[in-house]
């Protein structure tokens, strides 16, 4: 099983934040690479922004409320005070990740669907799917009015888990999935079909 005492727990935490720092550094500096066309640099930046949002999503999924670093990566010579970041609330984390994904979607730089020639690259379909999944987590009892987490606060008393259930979050998740399904269908994606009589047959 995976819990806070697992060796992987600290490893995932550090690896994802390292990836976030690399993405932020790339976003800030890629325009210095004038050998690449502006359109290419824009595509790279949007891909990096989407990847950074994905890393934050994985951190939120694994650890709950996490510190959001923002646009500026922490400098190598940062003081201890600069390194210690208070956690952001669940709502702040979700809103940040959703905004980053939407920014990548709206940029016009990403491919609609990466396809075989660009496997592994972030595209609009992936960003929309991730945003929908993010909203589903947000609406779930895990993050939506979870009174079991009432004691999870920052040192200043800031509440990190919302303590009142908000049913409108389910509507946001539903709408996000509807938008994704409509878009994905238009891009040629299809649902995997399972034959009831042969459950192991794709």
Annotate each predicted stretch with a short phrase:
Residues 60-61, 67, 137-146:
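Short coil/turn linking the two alpha-helices of tandem helical-hairpin repeats
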Residues 101-109, 178-188:
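Long, well-ordered core segments of solenoidal/helical folds
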Residues 128-134:
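TPR/Sel1-like alpha-solenoid repeat signature
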Residues 192-202:
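Residue-level detector of conserved catalytic or cofactor/ligand-binding positions
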